[in-house]
Amino acid sequence: MVEINNQRKAFLDMLAWSEGTDNGRQKTRNHGYDVIVGGELFTDYSDHPRKLVTLNPKLKSTGAGRYQLLSRWWDAYRKQLGLKDFSPKSQDAVALQQIKERGALPMIDRGDIRQAIDRCSNIWASLPGAGYGQFEHKADSLIAKFKEAGGTVREIDV
């Protein structure tokens, strides 16, 4: 499993804020780990909730958990990582694996957050440039949340 250091924790917290699961407005009993897309909560962490939610006539989703993981991706990563449940620890493990597969972990570790966000934009619909037709946050807002969560951003001399 991929290690969680302070930089990675801050990036995960930023993602949860961006995805709307742990933003101070969405109801949650567990920092967003219990949120189904659309706002409903779940309590059974033995497996992904697998609830198909119609968000609008053109958009349906099975997104669930802190990082709004789709059930089809949960099935693949559960097997790949040997996960036993959909617990917070398992949700973090999947998110970190997805970030790793995009080559963004070293960027996060050294503070190149804008580049890491760009690398991960095809995974999370709320990131700038995702192109899923959903609301996308601005990079500056995401970087501010990353810093607020305790992350350090590498300053680039211009």
From Swiss-Prot:
GO BP terms: defense response to bacterium; peptidoglycan catabolic process; viral release from host cell by cytolysis
Q: How does activity depend on pH?
A: Optimum pH is 6.6.
The UniProt entry, under CDD domains, shows:
lambda_lys-like
| InterPro entries on file | Endolysin_lambda_type, Lysozyme-like_dom_sf
Of the GO CC terms on this record, one is:
host cell cytoplasm
Task: Report the principal subcellular site.
Answer: host cell
The gene for this chain is R
Cite the EC number: 4.2.2.n2
Question: What would changing residue 31 to N do, according to UniProt?
Answer: No effect on lytic activity
What is the protein's given name?
A: Endolysin
Q: Which family does it belong to?
A: Belongs to the glycosyl hydrolase 24 family.
Q: Where in the cell is it found?
A: Host cytoplasm
Q: Which organism is it from?
A: Escherichia phage lambda (Bacteriophage lambda)
Presence of the UniProt keyword Lyase in the record: yes
Explain the regulation of its activity: Inactivated by zinc.
